[in-house]
Amino acid sequence: MAHQFFIDKRLHNALTFSEYVEKMKLDSEISDLSKLSDKEKEDFPMVQLNYQRVSRILRTYKIDEELLGLIKKISSPQIWMVISEAWCGDSAQNLPYIAKIAEHNPLINLRIVLRDSNLDIMDLYLANGTSRSIPKLVAFDENGNELFQWGARPKEAQELVVRLKNEGMEKEKFLEELHLWYGRDRGRTLENELKEILQNSIK
């Protein structure tokens, strides 16, 4: 049964990826920070950095051929929801790949739901039942039936974070290690996880 937010077309009316990136660009270029809230001021450096990350991935990424074949096998309309925010480093390192992958099949309608203004939707997809972790990808058919989920990080990246936290590493340092991992991986682990998901979900 479809969720109420799907029935109410909130997902269908959410941002396209192009709109999301344009908003991110404009937010990263604000010159007068005095007009921002305290939270927006705090997030501003991350939005700037994440816009650079997104731009680099969009410029350099080339899809894996096996994944491309699976994406092209999707033969009926799907809507892919990604819950995200511009300040989130994990979103910047994963969402551009998801967007470029989705581009290869016109039957995939990718929509970006902003977490902080849609917490009721986010709370349907908590990590471990407690954490509002993003990005979160959820795919639906045109009737709102859920097809698959992914997120908020590739499994290997999540295991790295858990290990470093358990070793007592400070947040600033383990985030640095995490983004070094993303830089080396270049989306390949995400691709492999999506390949496995699609192999199991494509009828």
Question: What residue spans do the PLM features occupy?
Answer:
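Conserved beta-strand and immediately adjacent loop positions that scaffold enzyme active sites
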Residues: 136
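Thiol-based oxidoreductase modules, predominantly thioredoxin-like and allied folds used
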Residues: 80-85, 98, 106-122, 140-142
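Local sequence-structure signature of Cys/Sec-based thiol-disulfide redox active-site neighborhoods
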Residues: 69-100
